[in-house]
């Protein structure tokens, strides 16, 4: 656009001014173009390092002979923020791919996906996590699927899963137009950290209870020290009752002996 404004200009003061404006506009356009591509400058194998996040390449495979040959399906755009949000960009299936997917579905074949686990490793040495569904469920769902990327607590990819909606195969007829575009929902599944024991709070509460007891020594008295005025009368009563019972038994025994001597 900037170069085009130099064409057909007449020589003269006005032409010189317009030419100057065009040369000023050209660097501005170049700067704007460079800024728009900042997130796509550094490309790796399977993943692209970006200042605004990580581009994780999503591949799929569906072959008539049940062999595995992965091709690019799209990209998972992984934000570098603390919220760990993720979005997806996908290609449209070609006519040949749609026909092949139908044929594989009729043969009860599998539809596979994969993503790389590590960043900065060549494709030959890289490790992938994979998942699959039946190709017929992919067809009958009209390419409506849900992909979940599973990560560890540090954010590293440890697994991937895919499900279709619906997930059954009933032999339903599907129009060719329904197999052009993917309708995908993608999630990040991160482990939930277990609750940390409140050790410090427990120790603090225990120390407060001990300090409270130290301030009130009355609470630390033994059971006897607290209730001796009730215990002693009961003990004395039991002792006196036992002594009177013993005296009565002795008197009855003496009377019986006297009767025997009279005979």
Swiss-Prot record:
- Keywords, sorted A to Z: Endoplasmic reticulum, Membrane, Signal, Transmembrane, Transmembrane helix
Please indicate if the UniProt record lists Magnesium as a keyword: no
Q: Where in the sequence is the signal peptide annotated?
A: 1-34
**What parts of the sequence cross the membrane?**
223-243
The job of this chain, per UniProt, is described as: Part of the endoplasmic reticulum membrane protein complex (EMC) that enables the energy-independent insertion into endoplasmic reticulum membranes of newly synthesized membrane proteins. Preferentially accommodates proteins with transmembrane domains that are weakly hydrophobic or contain destabilizing features such as charged and aromatic residues. Involved in the cotranslational insertion of multi-pass membrane proteins in which stop-transfer membrane-anchor sequences become ER membrane spanning helices.
Family affiliation: Belongs to the EMC10 family.
The domain of life for this entry's organism is: Eukaryota
Protein name as it appears in the record = ER membrane protein complex subunit 10
Lumenal-facing ranges:
35-222
Q: Name one GO cellular component term.
A: membrane
Designated gene of the protein:
emc10
Cite a single Pfam family from the UniProt record: ECM10
Give compartment(s): Endoplasmic reticulum membrane
Subunit-structure text:
Component of the ER membrane protein complex (EMC).
Q: How does it sit in the membrane?
A: Single-pass type I membrane protein
Which Gene Ontology BP terms does the record give?
A: protein insertion into ER membrane by stop-transfer membrane-anchor sequence; tail-anchored membrane protein insertion into ER membrane
């Amino acid at each position: 656009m900037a170069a085009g404004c130099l064409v057909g200009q007449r020589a003269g003061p006005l032409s010189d001014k317009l030419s100057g404006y065009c040369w000023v506009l050209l660097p501005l356009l170049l700067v704007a173009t460079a800024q728009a591509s900042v997130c796509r400058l550094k490309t790796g194998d399977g993943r692209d390092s970006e200042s605004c996040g990580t581009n994780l390449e999503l591949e799929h495979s569906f072959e008539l002979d049940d062999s595995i040959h992965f091709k690019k399906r799209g990209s998972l755009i992984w934000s570098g923020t603390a919220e760990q949000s993720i979005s997806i960009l996908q290609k449209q299936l070609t006519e040949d791919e749609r026909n092949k997917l139908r044929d594989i579905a009729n043969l009860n074949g599998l539809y596979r996906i994969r993503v790389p686990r590590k960043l900065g490793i060549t494709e030959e040495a890289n490790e992938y996590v994979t998942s699959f569904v039946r190709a017929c469920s992919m067809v009958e769902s009209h390419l409506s699927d849900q992909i979940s990327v599973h990560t560890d607590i540090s954010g590293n990819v440890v697994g991937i899963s895919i499900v279709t909606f619906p997930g059954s195969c009933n032999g339903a007829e599907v129009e060719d137009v329904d197999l052009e575009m993917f309708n995908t929902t993608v999630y990040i599944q991160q482990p939930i950290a277990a609750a940390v024991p409140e050790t410090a709070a427990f120790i603090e509460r225990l120390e407060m209870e001990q300090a409270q007891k130290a301030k009130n020594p009355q609470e630390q008295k033994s059971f006897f020290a607290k209730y001796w005025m009730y215990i002693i009368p009961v003990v004395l009563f039991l002792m006196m009752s036992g002594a009177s019972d013993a005296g009565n038994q002795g008197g009855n025994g003496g009377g019986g002996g006297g009767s025997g001597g009279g005979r």
